[in-house]
Amino acid sequence: MPLTRTLGATFSRYDKDEVRARLDWAPGLCTANGLLHGGAVMALADSTGAACAFLNLPDRSQGTTTVESKTNFLRGVRDGYIEAVSRPLHTGRTVVVIETDVRDQNDRLVARVTQTQLVLT
């Protein structure tokens, strides 16, 4: 994905049961206070979630589009990296629901994201 490359994220696992990607902390991805920007956290989670949804599409589907995305931010990140892990919660004919946990380098939960993806036919 172009955005994922622009952010500098790297995927380490890419299959229908789980998609993982890592994003290193960088000053250009931060708020004025030096915290990793929530938009960067959400962009990583959205990218892994979209990939997971795509891998779980029913036969003869064209793709997905996000109809809802909810993020709970639980802690800030001032250094190191984050890793997003996306897993399917529901894979239906018309909707795919993905849950993504974003953790810091110490395995602390940074954010939990739930995405609902409409299946395009």
Sequence positions of predicted segments:
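Non-catalytic linker/capping segments at the edges of enzyme domains
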Residues: 1-22, 26
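A generic structural signal for short beta-strands and their flanking turns/coil linkers
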Residues: 5-7, 17-19, 38, 63-69, ...
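Hydrophobic residues in beta-strands and at strand termini
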Residues: 23-25, 73, 119
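A conserved, well-ordered hydrophobic junction motif at loop->secondary-structure transitions
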Residues: 25-26, 30-44
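Active-site helix/loop of acyl-thioester processing domains in fatty-acid/polyketide metabolism
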Residues: 39-59
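Hydrophobic beta-strand-centered segment that forms part of the acyl-chain substrate-binding groove
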Residues: 52-83, 88
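HotDog/MaoC-like acyl-thioester-processing domains
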Residues: 75-121
